[in-house]
């Protein structure tokens, strides 16, 4: 069974997101844990949570994915920005425990000319501050395209962060297909090699989710502009190979390129039609 969903608005609660996911043929979804620009999160509605968990169990949902706000920059040169990232993630992870055993994704951040090593240290320090032994949520580092001074453009950078995290079993990776394509990993012509590289450097046991996005940009452009499935430089054949790869096919896939629900429904129907496992 293809584990597939898209990014949905959390404004009407978890049960509503679950119902929307089902209505478009999905069995999971991604959501922002708060406004993507980082304002205060909504109050937890425990009745809504309870109803969603029942709905998810009845409909055999895969793990859902909470996405941290874009403003979270754990490796900023500004100490206040780094402290803000710690507080946001700490609060988000406490809230994620209302929906236990799920996933929480964040962009590692930009080191802003401090250097990669300092950036990696700050990110690791944040994770060592916020992670708790008793948490059930797995925190995911997202692969990045390499715009500016972004950390996470290479598998080696992500591995170095993981190596410095004390509770490393609480941390994994979310692979964004647009980002790795734009970062210079040839998932179109040499997907097997890229998967082998990931396994050798990080380990496939750490790969927990995939952001399934096509790319507006040429290979290795370091641009990060998503395109709808089959309409970009990865192409439908490239996407088909990804969702059917034996080492990737059982992971949850999340569509992120902005779309209407009807558009996501069409993409999910298309993906199901080319899914062969």
Curated annotation (Swiss-Prot):
This entry's Gene Ontology molecular function terms read: deoxyribonuclease IV (phage-T4-induced) activity; DNA binding; DNA-(apurinic or apyrimidinic site) endonuclease activity; phosphoric diester hydrolase activity; zinc ion binding
Q: What does this protein do?
A: Endonuclease IV plays a role in DNA repair. It cleaves phosphodiester bonds at apurinic or apyrimidinic (AP) sites, generating a 3'-hydroxyl group and a 5'-terminal sugar phosphate.
Coiled-coil ranges from the UniProt annotation:
none
Superkingdom of this protein's organism: Bacteria
Spell out the PROSITE patterns in the cross-references: AP_NUCLEASE_F2_2, AP_NUCLEASE_F2_3, AP_NUCLEASE_F2_4
Q: Which PANTHER family match?
A: APURINIC-APYRIMIDINIC ENDONUCLEASE, ENDONUCLEASE IV ENDODEOXYRIBONUCLEASE IV
What reaction does this catalyse? Endonucleolytic cleavage to 5'-phosphooligonucleotide end-products
Question: Do you know which Gene3D superfamilies this protein is assigned to?
Answer: Divalent-metal-dependent TIM barrel enzymes
The organism's taxonomy opens as:
Bacteria, Bacillati, Bacillota, Clostridia, Eubacteriales
- This protein's name: Probable endonuclease 4
**Pfam annotation, one family:** AP_endonuc_2
Query: Which family, according to the similarity comment?
Result: Belongs to the AP endonuclease 2 family.
Name the coenzymes or cofactors required.
Zn(2+)
Key words, A-Z? DNA damage, DNA repair, Endonuclease, Hydrolase, Metal-binding, Nuclease, Zinc
Where is Zn(2+) 2 bound in this sequence? 142, 176, 211, 256
State where Zn(2+) 1 binds. 67, 107, 142
Give the co-factor note: Binds 3 Zn(2+) ions.
Picking any one GO biological process from the record gives: base-excision repair
Residues holding Zn(2+) 3: 179, 224, 226
What gene makes this protein? nfo
Q: Name the CDD domains on file.
A: AP2Ec
> EC no.?
3.1.21.2
Q: Does the keyword DNA damage apply?
A: yes
